[in-house]
């Protein structure tokens, strides 16, 4: 049984004060949630403060990115160990915005994920195709390449700290959402790929999230699909009431 994971990616939003206010509003709204893992990902500067604010709650803390080196002359980067020190339990890696805007590569995603898992963080690894790739019927080719590259080199026991998030680039911040069936089709493909390339047991336990304009009015249909194990939520996670409604998708 895969525990659903609902993750809120706040992207480049909220000051420290605004992040703390959001957490204070959110905590009582999700305090009674059972059978679901909850994670929020504020900006780097708010991580430590939000970590203290989440203490004693059932909400986990994620960073939005990391670097693969532990330390050194890498100006502007943050290591997985430093994120753990700031209170993080999770880190988002390879988000489409990182790939599209900052040239993140499949190799870089793999190096970051391996470094994160090595220090005990759960890596939420993002994959997904552009609209051009979907229209040219390259969705499975692109997603397959990204998943295969991202999961290279992991040992069997490390997969418990890996989550895949399928986020079609054409649905990020556009208001467009993959239909329940479109999302399920790709999630099923990812799980079958892991079955064939790694093992049935790992595929069965691997959580695969959907990301891409997830909102309170579409999350229930998505979560009803057999291979969708949660959601990576952007804009709709910025308001406590909206995010809490999605955490409590079961009603």
UniProtKB/Swiss-Prot annotation:
Q: Which reaction does it catalyse?
A: D-glyceraldehyde 3-phosphate = dihydroxyacetone phosphate
- Keyword vocabulary terms for this entry: Cytoplasm, Gluconeogenesis, Glycolysis, Isomerase
Give, as in the UniProt entry, the pathway in which the protein acts: Carbohydrate biosynthesis; gluconeogenesis; Carbohydrate degradation; glycolysis; D-glyceraldehyde 3-phosphate from glycerone phosphate: step 1/1
> A GO CC term?
cytosol
Entry similarity comment: Belongs to the triosephosphate isomerase family.
Q: Name one GO biological process term.
A: gluconeogenesis
Its annotated function is as follows: Involved in the gluconeogenesis. Catalyzes stereospecifically the conversion of dihydroxyacetone phosphate (DHAP) to D-glyceraldehyde-3-phosphate (G3P).
Q: Which CDD domains match?
A: TIM (cd00311)
Q: Which domain of life is it from?
A: Bacteria
Q: What is its EC number?
A: 5.3.1.1
Where does the chain bind substrate?
A: 9-11, 173, 213, 234-235
Q: Which Gene3D superfamilies match?
A: Aldolase class I
Top enzyme class: isomerase
InterPro entries to which the protein is assigned, alphabetical: Aldolase_TIM, TIM_sf, TrioseP_Isoase_bac/euk, Triosephosphate_isomerase, Triosephosphate_isomerase_AS
Its annotated compartments are: Cytoplasm
Official protein name in the record: Triosephosphate isomerase
PROSITE patterns attached to this UniProt entry? TIM_1, TIM_2
Using the UniProt record, give the first listed, main subcellular location.
cytoplasm
